[in-house]
UniProtKB/Swiss-Prot annotation:
It comes from Thermoplasma acidophilum (strain ATCC 25905 / DSM 1728 / JCM 9062 / NBRC 15155 / AMRC-C165). One of its GO terms (biological process) is translation. Belongs to the universal ribosomal protein uL16 family. GO terms for molecular function: structural constituent of ribosome. This is Large ribosomal subunit protein uL16. GO terms for cellular component: ribonucleoprotein complex; ribosome. It comes from the Archaea.
């Protein structure tokens, strides 16, 4: 089945739909790794990707953003010189009411009768000033990390900003 455009699910409407025990079956989220890189090292610079508007981020968009940052930082710095954590978990279940189209569809379908929909995916609900990603690195790779987070923000359905939470004086001296 074709994946619907993310704009169909990006607005927050109604209460969260998370009780999986009442559903027939929910597809697993595509994002499975939430923490990457060197978790033991204490890095001097920490940056966060912060949402500016309320939205729902599909599990595929979270995975695309994670892969984007991971690939860029692995090529630039290597796995030992950065840390990445994806904060929101896609708990909210997205539903879709499948509609038959084409010749003779009116005889087969029941229209809007019993139009509750079947689970098709999951999403994370994010509100303004919620942290989406936390990333840490050293001085040598700080500019690359900021660029990687900015490119990851493009893959998400909400405008985001990169906030430096640790090492502002170091980042200021580097011109970030």
């Amino acid at each position: 089945m074709v994946t619907k455009p993310a704009r169909m699910y990006s607005r927050i409407t109604g209460p969260a739909y998370t009780r999986k025990e009442f559903m027939g079956g929910v597809p697993y989220p595509k994002i499975t790794t939430f923490v990457q890189g060197n978790q033991k090292k204490d890095f001097p610079i920490e940056m966060r990707l912060v949402a500016e508007e309320p939205c729902q981020i599909r599990h595929t968009a979270l995975e695309a953003a994670r892969v984007s940052v991971n690939r860029r930082m692995t090529e630039a710095a290597g796995l030992d010189y950065f840390y990445l954590k994806v904060v929101p978990y896609p708990h909210h279940v997205l539903r879709e009411h499948k509609m038959a189209t084409g010749a003779g569809a009116d005889r087969i379908s029941s229209g809007m009768r019993a139009a509750f929909g079947r689970p098709v995916g999951t999403a994370a609900r994010v509100y303004p000033d919620d942290v989406i990603m936390i990333a840490r690195t050293d001085e040598a790779h700080a500019k690359e990390l900021k660029t990687a987070l900015r490119k990851a923000a493009i893959k998400l359905p909400t405008p985001c900003k990169v906030v430096i939470t640790k090492g502002k004086e170091i980042a200021g001296s580097l011109g970030i």
